[in-house]
Swiss-Prot record:
Gene Ontology terms for molecular function: rRNA binding; structural constituent of ribosome
Keywords: Ribonucleoprotein, Ribosomal protein, RNA-binding, rRNA-binding
SUPFAM superfamilies: S15/NS1 RNA-binding domain
Subunit structure comment from the entry: Part of the 30S ribosomal subunit. Forms a bridge to the 50S subunit in the 70S ribosome, contacting the 23S rRNA.
Keyword hit for rRNA-binding: yes
Protein name: Small ribosomal subunit protein uS15
Lineage: Bacteria, Thermotogati, Thermotogota, Thermotogae, Thermotogales
Source organism of this protein record: Thermosipho africanus (strain TCF52B)
UniProt-listed SMART domains: Ribosomal_S15
GO cellular component: cytosolic small ribosomal subunit
Length: 84
C-alpha cells in the first residue's frame, strides 16, 4: 500500500493529510516496512534505532488520540490491527 492509498483510507475529509489518524496509519506502514527490512538484515542497528524512534512516536500519537477521541482511537486500532 502506498502513501496516497493510506491517506485516502484514513483521511477525515478531502485534502486531509495530517490528521492524527493519517499520521498513525503512515507511521504504521513505515514500521511494517522497516520490520521486514530488519528480518533480512538483522545487524542493521542504524535502521533498528530508526524503527524504535518511529514506534515511540506512534505510541505518543496513539496516546493523544485515545485521550482526545476514544471512538476514533478504537476505529484506527481495529483498521490497522494493532491491539486486541
Amino acid at each position: 500500500m502506498n502513501k496516497e492509498e493510506i491517506i485516502k483510507e484514513f483521511q477525515i475529509h478531502e485534502g486531509d493529510t495530517g490528521s492524527t489518524e493519517v499520521q498513525i496509519a503512515l507511521l504504521t506502514a513505515r514500521i511494517k516496512h522497516l520490520t521486514e527490512h530488519l528480518k533480512k538484515h538483522p545487524k542493521d542497528y542504524h535502521s533498528r534505532r530508526g524503527l524504535m524512534k518511529l514506534v515511540g512516536r506512534r505510541r505518543k500519537i496513539l496516546k493523544y488520540l485515545r485521550n482526545k477521541d476514544p471512538e476514533s482511537y478504537k476505529n484506527v486500532i481495529q483498521k490497522l490491527g494493532l491491539r486486541k
